[in-house]
Swiss-Prot record:
Record HAMAP family: GlcN6P_deamin (MF_01241)
NCBIfam families documented for this protein: nagB, PRK00443.1-5
Bilayer-crossing regions: none
Subunit comment: Homohexamer.
The entry's keywords: Allosteric enzyme, Carbohydrate metabolism, Hydrolase
Keyword Hydrolase: yes
Alphabetical GO biological process terms: carbohydrate metabolic process; glucosamine catabolic process; N-acetylglucosamine catabolic process; N-acetylneuraminate catabolic process
EC number(s) recorded for this UniProt protein: 3.5.99.6
Naturally occurring in which organism (per UniProt): Salmonella typhimurium (strain LT2 / SGSC1412 / ATCC 700720)
Protein's recorded name: Glucosamine-6-phosphate deaminase
Length: 266
């Protein structure tokens, strides 16, 4: 696992965006051989999306031959709702870049057959071979996507019941009213994430410090879903300074020295 320790949330977003752009451009995608990118929602990736849009407008990257798969979606929330992940992605990213509509894949939380929707999502991912890079965030309790504590580390795309803590955390997007936050969501599984060629998780804020410590220094444990990254051959964790508060000094020193060339100048 790589740990990229930076100072601010803005630096995390810019580093992540640059990494994505470098991967896409090195891949040299075509219509017949697209780059497959996994994407998250929420507050954490907003600076990364802003930076990606800016780099696209500057001519540094095209998303014309990029196929995207989003991590999750609420169940029962109309896709036109301002807090649906469909709306979030179009508002913050898709509407500002040159990605073709047919290359965008979002789970349908209003599908008449939820099980079939999840199965077809997995099949579509497999039809492209694999996701080349999956970007994600992490919850205070260590969940990635909506794989809440005690999720199977071999799980696939499915419906999940959201914990009360997750709904409280997400209520900031629903006028602070937890009762407006859906109780269920569709989410890619931990196994789905681990199948990606590379996984990049962004960690911001002191409230995520315990989750980061569990990911980097703890044991692989289904109660801390983020610890699954230890099983991945190419995992990258990009974090700001407040989120590192629970890490041992020697751990942080080790990664600062290891990644010195990759973080200088930020």
């Amino acid at each position: 696992m790589r740990l990229i320790p930076l100072s601010t949330a803005e630096q995390v977003g810019k580093w992540a965006a640059r990494h994505i752009v470098n991967r896409i451009n090195a891949f040299k995608p075509t219509a017949d051989r697209p780059f497959v990118l996994g994407l998250p929602t929420g507050g954490t990736p907003l600076t990364a999306y802003k930076a990606l849009v800016e780099m696209h407008k500057a001519g540094e990257v095209s998303f014309k031959h990029v196929v995207t798969f989003n991590m999750d979606e609420y169940v029962g929330l109309p896709k036109e709702h301002p807090e649906s992940y469909h709306s979030f992605m179009h508002r913050n990213f898709f509407d500002h870049v040159d990605i073709p509509a047919e290359n965008i894949n979002l789970l349908n939380g209003n599908a008449p057959d939820i099980d079939a929707e999840c199965r077809q999502y997995e099949e579509k991912i497999r039809s492209y071979g694999k996701i080349h890079l999956f970007m994600g965030g992490v919850g205070n309790d260590g969940h990635i996507a909506f794989n809440e504590p005690a999720s199977s580390l071999a799980s696939r795309t499915r419906i999940k019941t959201l914990t009360h803590d997750t709904r409280v955390a997400n209520s900031r997007f629903f006028d602070g009213d937890v009762n407006q936050v859906p109780k269920y969501a569709l989410t890619v599984g931990v196994g789905t994430l681990l199948d990606a060629e590379e996984v990049m998780i962004l960690v911001l804020g002191h409230q995520k410090a315990q989750a980061l410590q569990a990911a980097v220094e703890g044991n692989v444990n289904h109660m801390w879903t983020i610890s699954c990254l230890q099983l991945h051959p190419k995992a990258v964790v990009v974090c700001d300074e407040p989120s590192t508060m629970e890490l041992k000094v020697k751990t942080l020193k080790y990664f600062n020295e290891l990644e010195a060339e990759n973080i200088k100048g930020l």
